[in-house]
């Protein structure tokens, strides 16, 4: 009889433990966000995007706009000083951003009330806002991205058209910035692909007895190597054009491709004591086959590009070297 009592007691204890566990997991399951398969940007519209705006409210100059013009993407940046920078953006980064946001992914609903916006940082004033637009400023979606959870590698967001806040895998955090240097095309002459002629002229007013203007073409020694070296060089920080208003003009580099498109870079130097800073201003002459959109992109550029002393010397050495 005693053995039977012991068995019954053990059975009751085991049943109680199983009951408690069932309550715990049932409650946990109810609190687990339900996932849906969707995308931040409707994939049907990804090929129609021609303008993107990013606003970062906690940055002084945290606003940047990208506009598709022909074969290029332009970035526009309004500075606190009232000046504007217009430069060529890195098309590969922008296309990657569009692709990422239009991928079907798991979205987890975490809230459906506006009172939770601030806690997830997805309000108009606390979140990073991204607008995807098409032609004629047609708005496809406006998204507010909130804070991220590094442990789960997720980020909170909501669409302007909905009160629902979701979280999803945070595999596009690098794109949520208004930093000009991140988005800009880093190469000094991205508009030229296959050069057929290169010329370089030094300002005679600054250099005593300089060499005459040097011109290289496809028949010149090591032309392919030299042109590839020039096209691989990259610039540094982008500044407003007024930065070089008081700078000394020192030289001009011109590079033309087979279509007749011509890129001209005017170089400037700013001397402050022992410190030297180098900049260039770029202008592009379109070819006869360039579209009106490409031409507009070329003529819209408004910026001064900083380069290192090493980069400037590399340009000179590359062009003037015998081999």
State each model region's role:
Residues 1-323:
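Secondary-structure "cap/kink" motif recognition
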